[in-house]
């Protein structure tokens, strides 16, 4: 059984972080703003990232035959796999009707759904920051049920917003949460490897001590 945290046991946030008003509409205007002329992630950069993630999975002897792309947006991850790993089965999902109609995804919500069969690689690229605390807990529970191999996750934290992100290109209508808040939820079912990669605790993969984050 997959452990999960009930809302009353979720990691606490400071009051000022609870007042953030995240975006809830991901329509054509959203995609024009963040993915058109000056996107926060270009197709070339996502291709480099996908190449690296896929190669690291191969290095750890986790052959990627199946992929779930959550909040797939413009579909850059799916397109990379279709172009370079035609044998891999990719399921791309999104909660945006516009994204599903425009880019060809399935209209599914990871907070309330998971596939019947788990997959080798789950991608959750810039999704969790839009969800409520309870929504993140539900999403991570379903992600853990979806993944028996590797999870790639990117989510901007409070520190990232202060020190890392390009504030002109990044959507700032999101929840501001600390990295430790997300780690506490993820660590119940995943082991942090680094560079956004998390290994399912169901995976029987021996890692050198310095390949993963300290416990």
Go through each PLM region and give its residues.
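Class I (Rossmann-like) S-adenosyl-L-methionine-dependent methyltransferase catalytic domain
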Residues: 1-117, 131-138, 142, 146-215
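Hydrophobic adenine-recognition pocket in adenosine-nucleotide-binding enzymes
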Residues: 127
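A conserved beta-strand element that flanks and buttresses the S-adenosyl-L-methionine
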Residues: 123
